[in-house]
Amino acid sequence: MNLCSSGATASTTSLSSTGQRNGGTSEGGGEGAGGGGGSGGGGGNSSNDGPSEAIHCFGSNGGGGGPEEVFHTSHSHSTANGGGGGGSSNGHSQQHNENNATMPPETRPKMVTVKHPESNKPKPTTKKSKPIQADQDVIKALQRCRDEGIKRLDLSKSSITVIPSTVKECVHLTELYLYSNKIGQLPAEIGCLVNLRNLALNENSLTSLPESLQNCKQLKVLDLRHNKLAEIPPVIYRLRTLTTLYLRFNRITAVADNLRQLVNLTMLSLRENKIRELGSAIGALVNLTTLDVSHNHLEHLPEDIGNCVNLSALDLQHNELLDIPDSIGNLKSLVRLGLRYNRLSSVPATLKNCKSMDEFNVEGNGMTQLPDGMLASLSGLTTITLSRNQFTSYPTGGPAQFTNVYSINLEHNRIDKIPYGIFSRAKGLTKLNMKENMLTALPLDIGTWVNMVELNLATNALQKLPDDIMNLQNLEILILSNNMLKKIPNTIGNMRKLRILDLEENRIEVLPHEIGLLHELQRLILQTNQITMLPRSIGHLSNLTHLSVSENNLQFLPEEIGSLEGLENLYINQNPGLEKLPFELALCQNLKYLNIDKCPLSTIPPEIQAGGPSLVLQWLKMHSPYRQM
């Protein structure tokens, strides 16, 4: 029955009936494609490495989704996997069972119980017949598509090698999903699908496209990610209705001037190719809102980029850019600009016109300064990342440049001081990373950073901490490793919200008794210092799970360590004076890892030590004078 001609909602089909499909793999980038629709929507993977942009295609009953990708210019790699959208799907496994039930006995997969190694050997014909069976299934799916007037067809992840010419009969199709197959070329008959609006061909082996594709004059979304294209197929330049074009992860080396014909494009991804030049044609794409040309070999941008006045996300990271044109200042709608890991020594002062930007990230360049007052002009900034450059001082512009900022990263530069009062207006500043600089002291007004939550001052030359650090009562993470600190002020006990305290590789000899007041502390890292004893108050750290005191001068552990019931990891290795462990350590029932290497423990037999934490704890318990209690 033809559902379309009868007035019913157009159906959707796939090789696994109407069930759910997951999108292909993604590796970041401002892209989203493929399936989804209706009440479902295309799912997939998301990662933090490109402009936030996702496309969900339209369908009646939901269904399979291509990969959905999001990029952020910050150096973050946290990922989350989302499932492919499905309108009324019960999941892939249920589909599999349903399909098995409806397949003829001769093609139904068999359940095999392995009794002998020989029975697990695959049949010689199994692998050879799979592509043939897949291609036969395609023929059946196309017949059904033709007979029922189906508008949405999902043949993704089906091991298809060839699309038969009978595809021309599926003239009702508006969406065709062929991603994650083994297709080397498309038949010319694909051009007969004149109603096609969405075509997903990502994750195949395409090297070209047929010229007949130009007949698909309603095509809006074309996904060609992860193929083997050495150039942008010429026919693409004639698809003037395209609004979204994904060409990520191919082998493209150049962009033809004909690109200017695609004036309706709003999203263009050329990420992860081999492009060395982006011509002036890019300036004709005045409707672009997202442009991703990251991970290429660009050294320059054309001035014409300034004509793309609707751009909100421009990702240029991981190229070889030597400069940015002044015309970048015309992009007043720009929210995110990715410039990480290029070869920039400066950025144009005109960037101060891009007042919609909420993030400024130039990590991994060769910059020594920013234009005067530029950051202050970008009053909407909330995140500033200047790490891994050659800055010797804070940018000029005074406190005004950090008014609305909550995160500042200046890691791995050559800055020797934090100016007094520089954060006096930064009432929302919660995260400051000054790791790997040349700081010798902290500013006297550090006590005014009252909203700070995370402070990283590792790998500097700090010799002391000011007493005013006690005012940072919202601080949860304090990293002071690899400095020259000899002591910790008693006032540290006022920082009651601390969860992580890292003091590794300093010159500390004594810990203050007040450290026992840090009841929220979960990780205490003290390794590579000169500590001779731990304060008895350490037993009050009821939330401590990780304690590292290796490479010190400990003579003993306090009995109170037995109160750390939540302790999971204890590092006391390489303490040459530590000859015995307290029996109370056996009370740490959750201890999973105990490192006692290179400690001259004379009381515990070597074979017990070699047996791991549980055996050591058992031995301590058995030999404890309190064991009868």
Curated annotation (Swiss-Prot):
> In which ranges do the LRR repeats occur?
149-170, 172-193, 195-217, 218-239, 241-262, 264-285, 287-308, 310-331, 333-355, 356-377, 380-401, 404-425, 428-449, 451-472, 474-495, 497-518, 520-541, 543-564, 566-588, 590-611
Matching InterPro entries, A to Z? Answer: Leu-rich_rpt (IPR001611), Leu-rich_rpt_typical-subtyp (IPR003591), LRR-SigEffector_domain (IPR050715), LRR_dom_sf (IPR032675), LRR_R13L4/SHOC2-like (IPR055414)
Location of the region described as Disordered in the Swiss-Prot/TrEMBL record:
1-133
One short Pfam family name for this protein?
LRR_8
SMART domains, sorted? LRR_BAC (SM00364), LRR_SD22 (SM00365), LRR_TYP (SM00369)
Q: Where is the composition biased (Gly residues)?
A: 21-45
Q: Which UniProt keywords apply?
A: Leucine-rich repeat, Repeat
Which residues fall in a compositionally biased region of kind Low complexity?
1-19
What is the recorded function of this protein according to its Swiss-Prot or TrEMBL entry?
Acts as a Ras effector and participates in MAPK pathway activation. Probably acts as a regulatory subunit of protein phosphatase that specifically dephosphorylates Raf kinase and stimulate Raf activity at specialized signaling complexes upon Ras activation.
Q: Which family does it belong to?
A: Belongs to the SHOC2 family.
For this protein, the record's PANTHER family field holds:
LEUCINE-RICH REPEAT AND IQ DOMAIN-CONTAINING PROTEIN 4 (PTHR45752:SF187), LEUCINE-RICH REPEAT-CONTAINING (PTHR45752)
| The name this protein goes by in its record | Leucine-rich repeat protein soc-2 homolog
From which organism does this entry originate?
Drosophila pseudoobscura pseudoobscura
Name of the gene this protein is made from: Sur-8
